[in-house]
Amino acid sequence: MSALLRSEARKALATSTVSWLLPLTAVVGVVGTLAPLVASSPGTDPLSDDGLQQAMHGAAAGATLVIVAGIVGTAGEWRFGQSTQTFLTTPRRSHVLLAKGLVHLAIGSIYGIAAGVAATAAAWGWYRSNGHTLPLERSAVWLTLLGCLAVSALFGLLGVAIGAIARSQTTAIVGVLGWHVLIEPTLFTASPTVFRWSPGMASFALRRQPSDDFLTAGPAALVLVAFIAALCAAGLRSVERADVTA
């Protein structure tokens, strides 16, 4: 298994998409952090728990890009005709998918750490320029950052699962972006009570975006993990039944 993990890690790190998505995720995290601070109303207290969470949850604003990296790492093998070689080398397809999942869980964590550091630096600069000190010791800050890191790591695994199910890189990426950016927010707006249980809204809750309509962080984490586990099972079934020459 260790050799398989090293192989999958080398393939992931050699993929240019994974390399340029890392700084892009950090940039989006900085924008997601500064935007609510700059746009906040004059009477808003930036040092309140809600104010801190509103700013710091933006560290995971680019987490959708982590899903894209996971999709590329899995569906890309079919797109570029590498699946035959991969599964001939390691016939146990479940082992291959597990290795990909673990590698992209780690990549998601790296993306999350990079985005968290960049977002914290940006927030620290904004607070300082406005006569405040960013209270890093406050739970509203570090629990939010931990939630952002968890979302980023889990989204790496989610991308692998989606890529395994779809096996079409373009279809999977377009579908994820359409669902996450357009469809899911629209459904949530129409019925918050029902669609707060959806995976995207659970991820917002886990990263502690302030809203009375979201789940609390604990149930949100369970929802997200259960959803990803179900997709991983579906992805494994799809890969095991797939024609690797396709």
Name each region found by the language model:
Residues 1-13:
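A short amphipathic helical element positioned immediately N-terminal to and/or at the very start
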Residues 16-73, 97-166, 178, 182, ...:
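Secretory targeting signals
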Residues 70-89, 94:
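Transmembrane helix boundary and interhelical loop/hinge segments in multi-pass membrane proteins
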Residues 241-246:
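Short cytosolic juxtamembrane segments of multi-pass membrane proteins
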